[in-house]
A protein has these predicted regions:
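Catalytic donor/gating beta->alpha subdomain of glycosyltransferases that bind UDP-sugars
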Residues: 2-66
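Membrane-interface alpha-helices
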Residues: 23, 151-162
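Membrane-embedded multi-pass helical conduit in multi-pass membrane proteins
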Residues: 66-69, 73-152
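General alpha-helical segment detector with a strong preference for membrane-spanning helices
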Residues: 14-15, 61, 81, 111, ...
Length: 162
């Protein structure tokens, strides 16, 4: 009850409702035996629609520790994109370039610290080499999907959702 009007994320939102009633009712099982694989989407458009859909429910999570983390990630990516634009239009380039490089390095270090053990757990460590090259795309799609998730609409299961 209370999540019927949300188009997706019912599984995650249900787990949070259960946890709100009993903090010990939901546990995480880190085991290769229970990994559930989902087929990837087929196109870039579907990828963005999926990410926008995910972002649209960010403020619906009952776990109040999650939203500040999501907001922080969004703001860091937004700032990186803004700095890049300022550098491209030659606005105080030296200062903004230094700031961009420092923030970009910090973001990359934090994310790789998280990503390495995850990649090894899922036996995907051979894909880690592409991580630095995909950072610009990650910044861009995070800003677009986050903004569209909050203020835009998306297609899901054949219907437009706002």
């Amino acid at each position: 009850k209370g999540i019927e009007d949300i188009a997706s994320g019912d599984d995650m939102l249900l787990m949070q409702k259960i946890t709100a009633k009993n903090k010990n009712a939901v546990k995480y099982l880190k085991s290769e035996k229970v990994i559930v694989e989902t087929l990837p989407v087929n196109t870039i458009g579907e990828f963005f629609q999926q990410r926008i859909r995910w972002a649209s429910k960010a403020d619906q999570y009952q776990d109040k520790t999650l939203f500040p983390v999501l907001l922080w990630v969004y703001l860091v990516n937004f700032l990186l994109l803004l700095l890049f634009v300022l550098i491209m239009i030659n606005y105080n380039t030296n200062y903004y370039l230094k700031l961009f490089l420092i923030l970009f390095a910090c973001k990359t270090i934090v994310e790789i610290y998280f990503l390495i053990p995850v990649a090894y757990f899922f036996k995907k460590q051979n894909t880690l080499w592409v991580f630095p090259f995909l950072q610009p795309m990650h910044i861009l799609y995070t800003v677009i999907a986050g903004g569209m998730g909050k203020f835009g609409s998306y297609q899901w299961k054949g219907r437009k959702v706002k």
